[in-house]
Regions:
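Metal/cofactor-centered catalytic core regions of large enzymes
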Residues: 42, 135-146, 151-569
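Terminal low-complexity/charged segments
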Residues: 1-208, 283, 365, 369-371, ...
Length: 569
């Protein structure tokens, strides 16, 4: 690799702090470094890079590498954002017989969900992990069956259930464990992505919260590794999310392109960036409309959705469909932008800028909006730092993080970029970040269309080399989507790890809910802009009366809007 390798100073500091601990080091790209370290030093190394060198834990995953090196492997991917911007992945090999490695979570809380998932999917034991509950697997899943092991199962067959009961224990961190009685309630499996929230309350005040997701886990990673070719996974990644699918397919294709050293033409890169910003527009306007709805301002809700329709028209003009599916391929993009389409898109962007400004002025001058959002759902900057939050969540808590600026990808190195942050740490701050990002997206769309490079759209004729790996990433509306791909020797992926932005934000929701009222819960959850379709139920536990009640989500939503006739009474 002839280009200058970034991250040398971090590596030197690591060698000085931990002599002899780094067993191997390799660059996948000029700014992506993977180091293999001695397993017993894993927590100390990750903590050192995280807190002392300015890293953020972007994704954590396992890999069954017994066919390659005789061991399992666990990867901790850190985005280095203090000084030189680069990626450092800390890798450890886990003995295939012992199956244990030291947990990083006690030192770096951001590792908690990733380590729980590695335990679920591979049966690897993070020794010292504070929360050993299942994360992904259901209660009735067999104990010794681990889906992502290479020799474990056929993804098309689901094993027979081992129990009919729901055994998951919801935890009240700030109360007595005897209050944690889990009621058995209905889950409507016809819903796209049900979730169960449990609020521990004293009267109307939320003492703590816990929640369980993954009720409809799709098993995409196993599907990709066993049944799909490289470009077929591109279309699967498009469908990770109904709103930010193009961000996921961009992150996936970029991961393979980085692994193979494929240089995507500049025109294709710029088109990717333009479409990512169109996707950001309709996502942010949707969230702003929902914020109006949760505060009882339904005229604002309808007006934001009216303006959002313009962004959907942009997508249809540029891509042929209101959803930007099926455009990315490894090596470039499938469809060019026509001159007349770009002219029409510029006109729509100008109109949208005027419409959004009018709506924002109306929104921020509405008294009820200020009363319901200022000081509500606070996310302390230290909590956001400890858990490596992303997107408007972390930016609204004083951390100016944005992958488009920190690690410019596709065409963003050529676009005018401004990172927005707020200091309020509350719901209104998250709304303001999204509002400012809407204006920035419109500016980038205009600039990209005016300065679209010439040249081809695709690179073709390359050969996939087995067992190459690299990261790909994109700044989706909710934060960065991180993909890691390792090529296989059968024209399929050996391993694909897909981490959506909301996955990085869920663990801190309980901190945002604490100290607020039950009627604020839907608004606080909505300010996270969670990437799931519905919440079927919420259980409210009165820690003083030691009673629990299952509240349908529609009833909680009504209470959030009307703030009368409490469902708890």
């Amino acid at each position: 690799m002839s280009e200058e390798k970034l991250g040398q100073q971090y590596l030197a500091a690591l060698h000085q702090a931990f002599p002899g601990v780094v067993l191997d080091e390799a660059w996948q790209t000029k700014d992506q470094l993977t180091i293999t370290v001695k397993v017993n030093y894993l927590p100390e190394v990750v903590e050192f890079l995280y807190y002392q060198q300015g890293g953020w834990l972007s994704v954590l995953f396992g890999n069954d590498e017994r066919q390659l090196c005789g061991h399992y492997a666990v990867y901790y991917v850190l985005s280095m954002e203090q000084g030189t911007k680069c990626w450092i992945t800390v890798r450890v090999e886990v003995d295939a017989n012992k199956l244990e490695f030291p947990s990083v979570t006690p030192r770096v809380p951001a590792a908690v969900w990733g380590e729980r998932e590695v335990r679920d999917m591979y049966g690897l034991i993070p020794v010292g992990l504070p929360d050993e509950r299942r994360l992904v697997l259901p209660d009735d899943w067999p104990d010794e069956l681990y889906p992502l092991r290479k020799d474990s199962m056929d993804y098309r067959q689901r094993p027979a259930p081992t129990t009919d009961a729901e055994t998951y224990e919801f935890i009240n961190e700030l109360g007595d464990k005897k209050n944690n009685v889990v009621p058995i309630g209905p889950l409507h499996v016809t819903s796209d992505e049900p979730g169960h929230f449990r609020l521990f309350v004293d009267g109307e005040n939320i003492i703590d919260a816990d929640y369980r997701l993954f009720y409809v886990h799709r098993g995409m990673e196993k599907l990709a590794e066993t049944r799909m070719g490289y470009n077929e996974v591109t279309f699967l990644s498009d469908r990770v999310c109904g709103i930010c699918g193009f961000a996921h397919s961009t992150a996936y294709t970029t991961s393979v392109e980085n692994a193979m050293g494929i240089q995507v033409p500049e025109r294709a890169q710029m088109i990717r960036a333009i479409l990512l910003e169109v996707e950001r527009l309709h996502s942010h306007l949707l969230n702003l409309g929902l914020a109006c709805h949760f505060t009882g301002f339904d005229s604002g809700f309808m007006q934001f959705f009216r303006v959002r329709e313009t962004s959907m028209k942009m997508a249809e003009i540029l891509t042929g469909a209101r959803k930007t599916y099926g455009l990315n391929l490894i090596g470039g993009i499938r469809r060019d932008l026509l001159k007349e389409d770009m002219i029409q898109t510029r006109q729509l962007a100008q109109q949208m800028r005027r419409d959004v400004q009018e709506l924002v002025d109306m929104l921020l001058s509405t008294p009820n909006m200020e009363q319901r959002t200022v000081g509500i759902g606070r996310l302390d900057p230290e909590i956001a730092r400890d858990f490596s939050n992303v997107g408007p969540m972390v930016c609204a808590s004083g951390h100016a993080r944005d992958t488009r600026a920190d690690h410019p990808f596709v065409g963003y190195g050529l676009l005018p970029m401004e990172v927005h942050s707020e200091q309020g740490c509350d719901v209104i701050s998250r709304l303001k970040v999204r509002i400012n990002e809407v204006y920035t997206s419109l500016n980038m769309i205009d600039f990209g269309l005016d300065n679209l490079p010439g040249g081809p759209l695709m690179v073709e004729g390359f050969t996939y080399i087995p067992h190459r790996f690299a990261l790909g990433f994109a700044e989706a509306p909710r934060g960065d989507d991180i993909h890691w791909s390792m090529t296989g020797d059968n024209q399929k992926l050996y391993r694909w790890r897909c981490r959506a932005a909301t996955y990085a934000n869920w663990p801190t929701l309980r901190y945002m809910l604490r100290g607020n009222t039950v009627s604020d819960a839907p608004l606080i959850i909505g300010s996270l802009d969670p990437c799931y379709s519905c919440t079927d139920r919420m259980t409210v536990v009165d820690v003083r009366k030691k009673k629990s009640k299952v509240v349908p989500y529609k009833e909680l939503e009504r209470y959030s809007i009307e703030r009368k006739n409490s469902p708890l009474k």
